[in-house]
Amino acid sequence: MTNIRKTHPLIKIINHSFIDLPAPSNISAWWNFGSLLGICLIIQILTGLFLAMHYTSDTMTAFSSVTHICRDVNYGWLIRYMHANGASMFFICLFLHVGRGLYYGSYTYFETWNIGVILLFAVMATAFMGYVLPWGQMSFWGATVITNLLSAIPYIGTTLVEWIWGGFSVDKATLTRFFAFHFILPFIITALVMVHLLFLHETGSNNPSGLISDSDKIPFHPYYTIKDILGILLLVLALMTLVLFSPDLLGDPDNYTPANPLNTPPHIKPEWYFLFAYAILRSIPNKLGGVLALVLSILILMLFPVLHMSKQRSMMFRPLSQCMFWILVADLFTLTWIGGQPVEYPFIIIGQLASILYFMIILLILPTISLFENKLLKW
């Protein structure tokens, strides 16, 4: 009798994806972040579901319903902070996952890569709408500022913004629809994740050397299942440490003040994981230019397969490209820092220089260095 694992129509899909999947023998801990992102998504959907049971998406009661969750619901404070800080862990894993893809040339699987970029956009949209739901000061003003950016679109901009708002300002209609979208998007993300994995399993995983690993594969289970479990334990440890010791470390104190359209906070800024893009947006004095730069700062990831000039796939054996890659990482840290600072000297000029450097490295410096390294191989 053949094993049910290999014959049952449903179970065999799971078997081919997580058990008998041939995996390269040399993939490092940088390959753990895919599974960690899966765990983050599950945590977010579950905690979000329980929060939605007690939350009300009405401007009059939204803020007090969140207070009610934290004060009166059994372990409501835990669920709420796991959800809020789970988003931070999600983005940490996302950035590391994308960084791994850039470093090791995983973007040459361009269907997988492009679905990944779409996923990044979807997660960012979900996180933005989720931040609006508690209806604190930063929720309200963040929603106002970010949705207002669409008014920079020529001709249809203002109409589009009012259509998204459902009125002439961010109000009840906006909150209700944001809650609806925030609820549905994670399920769309889950479907996209399945497509992402489908395309990945068409080609198999990349590995640190960037070389074809068909001649040396090992089964995913038990080798990488046990490795993933270690990663998951560390992720949960980090998340629960954050939740139980300093749950408000990454939040904004302004969001503990109920939304007031008549009182603008002194510094409107998004959550930390959007600060790099926010800094790029602010570094251009023109509204439409800023919005384009903001979108391009993420969309530029789709250009990496086209901009790959090296004869080698991975950066493992390319010290000059490695150096530029880490300068790019440092630049992103700089942009994140600038995004959280007020718009004044010297932060304005630092932000502008960091923004120029960001696009320069990706569009010009990395491809040029790759071509130079190709020449070095001949000498």
Curated annotation (Swiss-Prot):
Cofactor note: Binds 2 heme b groups non-covalently.
Entry similarity comment: Belongs to the cytochrome b family.
Transmembrane regions: 33-53, 77-98, 113-133, 178-198, 226-246, 288-308, 320-340, 347-367
Keywords tagged on the record: Electron transport, Heme, Iron, Membrane, Metal-binding, Mitochondrion, Mitochondrion inner membrane, Respiratory chain, Transmembrane, Transmembrane helix, Transport, Ubiquinone
Positions with a binding annotation for heme b b566: 97, 196
Chain positions recorded as a ubiquinone binding sites: 201
UniProt effect for mutating residue 306 to I: In strain: Isolate MVZ 152779
Compartments in which it is found: Mitochondrion inner membrane
Signal sequence, renumbered to the chain: none
InterPro entries: Cyt_b/b6_C, Cyt_b/b6_C_sf, Cyt_b/b6_N, Cytb/b6-like_sf, Cytochrome_b, Cytochrome_b_C_euk/bac, Cytochrome_b_N_euk/bac, Di-haem_cyt_TM
Main localisation: mitochondrion
Protein name: Cytochrome b
GO biological process: mitochondrial electron transport, ubiquinol to cytochrome c
Function (record text): Component of the ubiquinol-cytochrome c reductase complex (complex III or cytochrome b-c1 complex) that is part of the mitochondrial respiratory chain. The b-c1 complex mediates electron transfer from ubiquinol to cytochrome c. Contributes to the generation of a proton gradient across the mitochondrial membrane that is then used for ATP synthesis.
Cofactor annotation: heme b
Pfam families referenced in this protein's UniProt entry, alphabetically: Cytochrom_B_C, Cytochrome_B
